A protein has these predicted regions:
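Short histidine-centered catalytic/ligand-binding loop motif
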Residues: 152, 161-167
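C-terminus-biased signal that marks the final domain/tail of proteins
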Residues: 1-53, 58, 167-305
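A contiguous strand-loop segment
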Residues: 16-158, 186-188, 258, 279, ...
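Internal, well-ordered alpha-helical segments in soluble enzyme and binding-protein domains
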Residues: 159-162, 172
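Short, structured patches in soluble enzyme cores that scaffold and shape functional sites
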Residues: 69-71, 113-114, 133-137, 162, ...
Length: 305
């Protein structure tokens, strides 16, 4: 999509400051697509500050782990009065793709992504772990990290680049958890991580420089799922944006005995968990390698977020 309201050419020089291979991939996308380099750079940056999501990991009574997410994007970035929808999700739905990353003709990981975007927000290493990233709104947020990067302070990882790096290189749940917990980042985030053994599921709450909390599955005490929207679990969500309570209510009513991917899809289809910002839903089951994504549209009556 075109952002004529911004002079995006000023972002083009920043591409060379990005780590390899992301810088070269962005240049390649610009060359092949014919889009200005600054516009492709912007397309790869603004996910650091505008993503609103719901992610969960759940374990059934047999020890099978499920991981799913709604990706909601484009809050306050333009409302289409005629279609009664946000403009950005309308642009992004046709760009949504499922990718299979291979090395030596062997699948390393799978991801739901947007064409032209080199970072990762949702992915699975089949048989090993699943991973989603949700934005964490904070005063010391993504804007600050990006400004510091522009000014030359570049000692942190871009969130989506870290997610991709973990999907590419981590070979176990424990290794992925360690990298997501300890790597310095440009923006605060929630990483929702699922493994391949009973009890392996957590929400990692991150500031830009530290890990603030790791909320883990705890079956002995009845915690058979973890669920994250965009608020710290020890705080109440904003009353205008409470997706957490309805989602948890649906999960509790479903029960651990009856949890499954179709049941989780139904949970993520419940309003306001499903809303006008929802672009796609991804369902993952690590042991079988099941990886499914669905484009979403919330029919009226439906809340904006």
């Amino acid at each position: 999509f075109s952002c004529s309201w911004a002079k995006l050419s000023v972002l083009a020089p920043l591409v060379d400051t990005l780590p390899f291979p992301f810088n070269e991939e962005i240049k390649g996308i610009a060359d092949v697509s014919g889009l200005p380099l600054g516009e492709v750079m912007f397309f790869n940056v603004f996910y650091e500050i505008f993503t609103v999501c719901t992610s969960l990991v759940a374990e059934d009574t047999t020890g099978k782990l499920y991981h799913a997410r709604n990706l909601d994007f484009g809050l306050f970035l333009g409302w289409d009065i005629k279609k009664h929808s946000w403009e950005i999700p309308e642009y992004l739905r046709p760009l949504t793709v499922n990718l299979d990353f291979q090395r030596n003709n062997k699948t390393i990981f799978k991801s739901t992504n947007f064409a032209g975007y080199v970072g990762m927000l949702t992915g699975m290493r089949p048989g090993i772990f699943t991973l989603t990233m949700n934005e964490r709104f904070n005063i010391d947020g993504g804007y600050i990290g990006i400004i510091e990067w522009i000014l030359g302070k570049r000692d942190g990882f871009w969130m989506s680049f870290l997610t991709r790096s973990v999907l590419e290189n981590a070979t176990s749940y424990a290794q992925a958890k360690d990298q997501l917990t300890n790597t310095k980042m440009l923006a605060p985030a929630y990483f929702i991580l699922g493994g391949n053994r009973s009890g392996e599921g957590c929400v990692i709450t991150r500031s830009r420089k530290a890990c603030l909390d790791v909320w883990e599955l705890d079956l002995k005490h009845g915690s058979w799922y973890v669920l994250e929207t965009n608020y710290d679990r020890w705080k109440d969500p904003l009353f205008l944006d409470n997706r957490r309570t309805p989602a948890m209510k649906c999960l509790n009513e479903t029960t651990q005995k009856k949890i499954s991917l179709p049941a989780i899809y139904d949970v993520l289809s419940t309003k306001p968990v499903l809303n006008k910002l929802t672009t796609y839903t991804t369902l993952m089951e690590v042991s079988s390698g099941t990886f499914e994504a669905y484009l979403r549209d919330c029919p009226d009556p439906c809340i904006p977020w």
